[in-house]
Amino acid sequence: PAFEKDSCGVGFVMNMKGEKSHEIITQGLEILKKLEHRGACGSDSATGDGAGILIQIPHLFFQKNCTGIKLPEPGRYAVGNIFLPVGEDTKQGQEIMERAVVTEGLELLGWRDVPVDNTTIGKTARSVEPVVKQLFVGAGPDIPDQLAFERRLYCVRKRSAWGIRRAGLNDNNESFYTCSLSSKTLIYKGQLMAPQLETYYLDLKDPNMVSAL
């Protein structure tokens, strides 16, 4: 135990009955803020070394906010939070992700722009701020269960990362990154201080954003 040391702070909150609510997310964000002392910053005191939150996929929230995307029942679609390069490379990054989805025999359902407010983040973080989009992927009729679906999604992540490297989009920075891609959970994260997460990602304030953990 004396050697079990790490610089990261991790907190957990859940509803023991599996009942989803926005309160769980609010409590999770409060835990995150109380762990701010486990993070770090450099000369730019408003740029952190990273903070994030993992929640269950909020089906009702996406039904209300994903206009133009027809979502299957929960468990039969996945959501990915994707960091993409800014400018002309944004579209190319999306196309590489889309090809990986199709190659793995999955259904491309669409994209959603993730609303953010960068007014409180530091200059350093803002200088490397990516485009944040959500990718929606359907399981398709030939995927027998959620476990098989998750395996295909893992392959999508690996194929897209390889495609990005091959295209040279990450030669000068790490602006392409898959935060998460799953039919079960969703991760909101960034180069942020702990208290900045809930102000940066506007989704986290929506009462329809619910989770049991």
Where on the chain are the PLM-derived regions?
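N-terminal segments that mediate ammonia production and transfer
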Residues: P1-L213
